Amino acid sequence: MKIYKLQTPVNAILENIAADKSISHRFAIFSLLTQEENKAQNYLLAQDTLNTLEIIKNLGAKIEQKDSCVKIIPPKEILSPNCILDCGNSGTAMRLMIGFLAGIFGFFVLSGDKYLNNRPMRRISKPLTQIGARIYGRNEANLAPLCIEGQKLKAFNFKSEISSAQVKTAMILSAFRADNVCTFSEISLSRNHSENMLKAMKAPIRVSNDGLSLEINPLKKPLKAQNIIIPNDPSSAFYFVLAAIILPKSQIILKNILLNPTRIEAYKILQKMGAKLEMTITQNDFETIGEIRVESSKLNGIEVKDNIAWLIDEAPALAIAFALAKGKSSLINAKELRVKESDRIAVMVENLKLCGVEARELDDGFEIEGGCELKSSKIKSYGDHRIAMSFAILGLLCGIEIDDSDCIKTSFPNFIEILSNLGARIDY
């Protein structure tokens, strides 16, 4: 895919940003904890979340779908499927399903694409094995495909050494099948969509005031079925916020965006860098929702070292902002970037250099010198949707060819359509 330099300003109101991926995954998986029909409007129709629907279908759920409205009728009992459960490119789907299936009697095989099957799963499989789960796979159950033989699990008191919503949610799901009360704690607060949704479903879970500790009781009855409207994804919206900032005389308003405090850290970073950006809350139900207004801005360099778990998905796009800011910027304490869909530290630095930007890898992040003269280049996405979309936005300034853009469909199927509607010229 080739993105040509955009010569005109962008002025738009965007209401069709992709639905939130994290909430879509959880809606589908958590429906298996109920016994009645679950309904979601604005479900994300991307490859990752459609794969999750297929997984729960193979576990016995009945699914009705009309456009982005999805109804799920859970099975009375989870089936032991006669096929591999394909998670595609989604680490969220795989890690959450490991936790869910570990305590269900049956035999299950989870696999994914070539990128997912090389991402670390021991952070989930190890603590589950310690409480009685039987999980088998390459490199001591660190790499998929993974085979899970569901067992009754022992209660646990688990302290996570990493701040990860995926680890947290997997352990919560396993705790529901344990033989007694379980506790979970983490070193810093990760995304809390699971807690928010499960509390709305009347799950037997208690959260400490600071959000760092959980007490989870085994399930004694089905949870309350869901009927929700899924807001739009702030991680997906971020690309078009960035576009408005870097393109002269541009302004964009984005509506129905999820504004959960654990999801807007990257927006706060842009504000600290000088971006003219406002977030307004319009609804506060089980999640905080609102609109974002942003316009062309001059950015200044910044050091980012806190709340990294809250901006891990936006880090590649933030690197683009760093490259266009005045002065040096850095991101540290972000070693988790090395085990995402790609090694995002290495890949961002490699590709930014190809575009004429001075960038340097750190063990746990990167340093970028802003204000370099950009040049048109061909970059590699390494199958990582966030790398591809970040450089597509940079391409609006200098023109860029991206070697694998199909990966964008895993999270944001109408990204190219929106980009084209804003005036971008795109060739395949």
UniProtKB/Swiss-Prot annotation:
InterPro entries: Enolpyruvate_Tfrase_dom, Enolpyruvate_Tfrase_sf, EPSP_synthase, EPSP_synthase_CS, RNA3'P_cycl/enolpyr_Trfase_a/b. GO terms for biological process: amino acid biosynthetic process; aromatic amino acid family biosynthetic process; chorismate biosynthetic process. 3-phosphoshikimate binds at K21, S22, R26, S164, Q166, D313, K340. GO terms for molecular function: 3-phosphoshikimate 1-carboxyvinyltransferase activity. Disulfide bonds: none annotated. It catalyses: 3-phosphoshikimate + phosphoenolpyruvate = 5-O-(1-carboxyvinyl)-3-phosphoshikimate + phosphate. It is found in: Cytoplasm. The keyword ATP-binding does not apply. The keyword Isomerase does not apply. It is an enzyme of class 2 (transferase). Pathway: Metabolic intermediate biosynthesis; chorismate biosynthesis; chorismate from D-erythrose 4-phosphate and phosphoenolpyruvate: step 6/7. The active site is at D313. Signal peptide: none annotated. Monomer. HAMAP family: EPSP_synth. NCBIfam families: aroA. Belongs to the EPSP synthase family. This is 3-phosphoshikimate 1-carboxyvinyltransferase. It comes from Campylobacter jejuni (strain RM1221).
